[in-house]
């Protein structure tokens, strides 16, 4: 069986070796954490020569300075019993340590046997007594800010500027109404032009339909004319034969008459045919020109309508 050696409660030796190997444990919840718990936590870093637990803090005395510094590095900032421990070397005061703890540590080093509980109670009593004697800091009153009053000349200036703004608005309204009237008149003229163009297009389409119907009917009429001219030549030939049976003079006369009669018909047909073709080609060219002109007018009217819509 291994017996656990109890450590001493002496942690206030003034020799330099003891001071440099002593560890201060601050912000310790002494209501929950006991001396045995502190010894078990810090004994893993080296041999603990002494341990003393007080209200809110404790001291651990190591036999070697190296063990003390290892404990500070390993346990500083550890959360124990819901509180973060503030651990550092007792011989090296920390700047951010509370004033009460610093004075307690210096008081420890001043004497060999010192009652820590008495010192802590005395220090707290003096601290609260000093705070009670301090006068409260007076709170400065808020200085009321005075708002500048509106002067009369400013009001007059505002009144003088109002008619200018109204005049500018009225001029803008009149110019806008004039532009609207101009746009409406332009739209009316464009509408009338469009109606005229549509009527012209309708007339041209009707004319084209009539020409197409006439062209369809013309080939049949030409064939009928050719057949009638052929029948007339045969009849004239029969007459010539009869005249030949009657006499030579009659036969010669009939031959000459038959040979002379078709020539004027061919001339008349050719004369009649050529002007009709020329007239048809001219009519077709005129109609195509009118169609192209009407299409251009339609495109121009559409462009103007689009521009008017964008302006509106």
Swiss-Prot record:
> Chief localization class?
nucleus
Region Disordered, as annotated, extends over: 214-312
Q: Where is the composition biased (Basic and acidic residues)?
A: 214-226, 293-303
**Keyword Oxidoreductase in annotation:** no
Transcription as UniProt keyword: yes
Sequence positions bearing Phosphothreonine: 268, 274, 292, 304
Q: Where does the signal peptide begin and end?
A: none
- GO BP terms: cholesterol homeostasis; mRNA processing; negative regulation of transcription by RNA polymerase II; RNA splicing
> Cross-link Glycyl lysine isopeptide (Lys-Gly) (interchain with G-Cter in SUMO2): which residues?
4, 94, 99, 159, 165, 179, 191
PROSITE patterns tied to this protein: RRM
Domain (RRM) spans 21-92
Give the Gly residues compositional bias ranges.
228-253
Residues where N6-acetyllysine occurs?
A: 44, 165
Per the record, residues carrying N-acetylserine are 2
Q: Which cellular compartments is it found in?
A: Nucleus
Look up the coiled coil feature and give its residue ranges: 184-216
GO CC aspect terms: catalytic step 2 spliceosome; nucleus
- Sites bearing Phosphoserine, chain numbering: 135, 270, 294, 301
Entry-linked InterPro entries: hnRNP_C, Nucleotide-bd_a/b_plait_sf, RALY_RRM, RBD_domain_sf, RRM_dom, RRM_HNRPC/RALY_subfam
Task: Fetch the PANTHER family from UniProt.
Answer: HETEROGENEOUS NUCLEAR RIBONUCLEOPROTEIN, RNA-BINDING PROTEIN RALY
Assembly mode: Identified in the spliceosome C complex. Interacts (through its RNA-binding domain) with FUS (through its RNA-binding domain); both are components of the same RNPs.
**Family per similarity comment:** Belongs to the RRM HNRPC family. RALY subfamily.
Q: What is this protein called?
A: RNA-binding protein Raly
Species of origin reads Mus musculus (Mouse)
């Amino acid at each position: 069986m291994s017996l656990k050696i109890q450590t001493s409660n002496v942690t206030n030796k003034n020799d330099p070796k003891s001071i440099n190997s002593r560890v201060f444990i601050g912000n310790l919840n002494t209501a929950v954490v006991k001396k045995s718990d502190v010894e078990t936590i810090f004994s893993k870093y080296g041999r603990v020569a002494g341990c003393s637990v007080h209200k809110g803090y404790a001291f651990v005395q190591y036999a070697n300075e190296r063990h003390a510094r290892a404990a500070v590095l390993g346990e500083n900032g550890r959360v124990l019993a819901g509180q973060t421990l503030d651990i550092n070397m007792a011989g090296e005061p920390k700047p951010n340590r509370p004033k009460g703890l610093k004075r307690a540590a210096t008081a420890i080093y001043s004497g060999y046997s010192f009652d820590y509980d008495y010192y802590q109670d005395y220090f707290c009593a003096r601290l609260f007594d000093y705070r009670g004697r301090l006068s409260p800091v007076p709170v400065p009153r808020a200085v009321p800010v005075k708002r500048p009053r509106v002067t009369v000349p400013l009001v007059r200036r505002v009144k003088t500027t109002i008619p200018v703004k109204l005049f500018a608005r009225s001029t803008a309204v009149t110019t806008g109404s004039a532009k609207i009237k101009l746009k409406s008149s332009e739209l009316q003229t464009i509408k009338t032009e469009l109606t005229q163009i549509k009527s012209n297009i309708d007339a041209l389409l009707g004319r084209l339909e009539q020409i197409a119907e006439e062209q369809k009917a013309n080939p049949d009429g030409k064939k009928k004319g050719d057949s009638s001219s052929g029948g007339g030549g045969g009849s004239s030939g029969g007459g010539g034969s009869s005249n030949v049976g009657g006499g030579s003079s009659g036969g010669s006369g009939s031959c000459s008459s038959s040979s002379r009669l078709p020539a004027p018909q061919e001339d008349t047909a050719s004369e009649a045919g050529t002007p009709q073709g020329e007239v048809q080609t001219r009519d077709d060219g005129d109609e195509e020109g009118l169609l192209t002109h009407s299409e251009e007018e339609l495109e121009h009217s559409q462009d103007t309508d689009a521009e008017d819509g964008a302006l509106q």
